């Protein structure tokens, strides 16, 4: 069963999800280890550049397209649940400035490691991934990349609650331009699962919190 269905609709306890996160951590580690001999100074520079294209350039492109279609002004301050926030352009610039371009983790990249592309086999107690990207940000066939992107995609599901949003488990009201009331419907169990994830998940020397700028940009790239 896909993890997004389990996460949103099932009632599996936090200790089940700790096991899932350990499977994912092992999967990412294996993807780094099995490709270590393929990474060199030449292709690491290429991979570094394509990683930047995949996160930063794609976000800017998608946001600009959205602005043209919606006539929204991304330069004005926003408000969420009564809290004054910076403009969305300021948020984008801040996230880009906080990406650590020296902390790449190169390996075999899935490229879309969201919960809907991860299956859990209860009989074998294994995860199985489907629908890998297989191309880089420029459209070239490649299975190598920066695995920080894969971890950010998992963040997207666990911390960003992307699958809850897609399933309609939220309430959103826009009272005026970029002034929102927003609630995602979760229980205390999900909050505990998020805490376990943040405390236990690792990619090399990185924790999920280190990838929050990329995670935010992933959401903005989906506008």
Where are these regions (language model features)?
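Active-site acidic catalytic loop and adjacent metal/ATP-binding pocket
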Residues: 93-145
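Active-site activation/catalytic loop segments of kinase-like enzymes and analogous catalytic loops
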Residues: 127, 135-201, 216-223
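Short, solvent-exposed secondary-structure capping/transition elements
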Residues: 7, 37-40, 163-168, 210
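All-alpha amphipathic helical-bundle segments outside canonical DNA-binding/catalytic cores
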Residues: 205-215
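Conserved short submotifs of the Hanks-type protein kinase catalytic core
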Residues: 1-4
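Hydrophobic transmembrane helix bundles of membrane-integrated enzymes that assemble
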Residues: 70, 74-98, 118-119, 126, ...
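Conserved kinase catalytic-core helix
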Residues: 6-66, 70-73, 86-103, 109
């Amino acid at each position: 069963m896909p993890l997004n269905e389990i996460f949103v609709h099932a009632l599996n306890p936090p200790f089940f999800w700790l096991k899932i996160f350990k499977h994912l951590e092992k999967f990412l580690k294996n993807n780094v280890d099995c490709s270590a001999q393929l990474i060199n100074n030449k292709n690491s520079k290429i991979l570094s550049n394509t990683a930047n294209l995949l996160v930063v350039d794609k976000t800017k492109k998608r946001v600009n397209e959205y602005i043209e279609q919606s006539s929204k002004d991304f330069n004005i301050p926003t408000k969420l649940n009564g809290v004054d926030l910076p403009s969305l352009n300021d948020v984008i610039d801040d996230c880009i400035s906080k990406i650590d371009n020296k902390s790449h983790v190169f390996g075999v990249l899935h490229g879309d490691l969201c919960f809907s592309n991860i299956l859990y086999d209860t009989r074998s107690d294994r995860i199985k991934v489907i629908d890998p990207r297989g191309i880089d940000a420029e459209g070239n066939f490649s299975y190598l990349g920066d695995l920080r992107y894969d971890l950010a995609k998992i963040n997207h599901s666990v911390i960003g609650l992307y699958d809850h949003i897609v399933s309609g488990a939220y309430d959103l009201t826009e009272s005026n331009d970029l002034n929102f009331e927003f609630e995602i419907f979760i229980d205390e169990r999900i909050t505990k699962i998020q805490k376990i994830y943040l405390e236990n998940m690792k990619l090399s020397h990185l924790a999920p919190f280190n990838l929050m700028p990329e995670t935010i940009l992933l959401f903005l790239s989906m506008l």
